[in-house]
Amino acid sequence: MRILVDYRPALRARTGVGEYMHQLVRAYTRATRDEVTIFTSSWKNRPAAGLGAALGVHVVDRRIPVRVLNYLWHRAGWPPIETVAGRYDVVHAPHPLLIPARHAAQVITIHDLFFLSDPERTRAEIRRDYPALAAAHARRAHAVVTSTEYGRGLVTQQLGVPADRVYVCRPGAPAWRSLGRAPNIPRGGCVLFVGTLEPRKNVGVLLDAYARLRQRRPSAPPLLIAGRDTPEAAGWLRRIAEPPLAGHVRHLGYVPDEEREALYAGARVLVLPSLDEGFGLTALEAMSAGVPVIASNRGSLPEVTGGAATLLEPTDVDGLAAALEQIVADDGVAAERARAGLAQAATFTWDAAAATLRQAYTDAVARR
């Protein structure tokens, strides 16, 4: 088969969706002999030199602004991918909306439906397009890819997609190389948050809980926040520059994949208090590095962590502060959580994801 994958979310700084698509493409090309092409478009950003060779793919790059192309595709259903990038058997979108196609089987990706349950906490483009179009696009798709059984349930129950058209491609655990602790982490470790600073990540509750932790335990390790900021994060960033958090909380900005492992190597605990998560790749990364995880009990996080994490209501500031104090203060609890996380992470493989994706593409072509 000739496959085209929309790679645009991974073109710049790879966060959740971009990292998922990047690793899925890499696993797929290693596991199959299909001809894979990645599609990128941006007015300013170009694919890195050698990207195609590194992934084992062809690259089609167009100097079209992302927002312009998205508006045309989502609102006008034009131009078809054949006009933009050529003819393929399958075209795979990394998001819930179809890429227009005359001939290719159309595959979409849905991790969660947060844009339906809490649209005011999403970006403007998502608020504009996704709630109105997602259900119709999902029902028209020849196959829907999701990363968890939680996501599969949302797609079948809320969007009305038949279960046999939804394929769960769980991300694989990263193969960490046991690098040393990052130089900006003290020997006592750190409380770590990794993720884009968007509203649903619920960083405000983390800051509240960390402030309470420091009241109870002034010697608590620093809080490091690793992730790209957004306009909505301005209030959080102001808070960490002022007492009582100033000097104890640091925003590192986006940390690329090759440096993130060193952050985990020096972390005492990862905290992920999200209001919703379609997967929560950072929880899997932390478990793979032997770092205890405290996470919310929302979305896919209970499924992903599989009993290895401390789970809390994302609005429970006192509960989060107490959970942090327990792991910071008790080496035995921290070690038990680390062991459980390593065992859970070992159940996630990219080989399995690639095999499921191959079946999704094969079935999609048959339904075309």
Feature names for model-found ranges:
Residues M1-R368:
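Carbohydrate transferase catalytic cores enriched for Leloir-type hexosyltransferases
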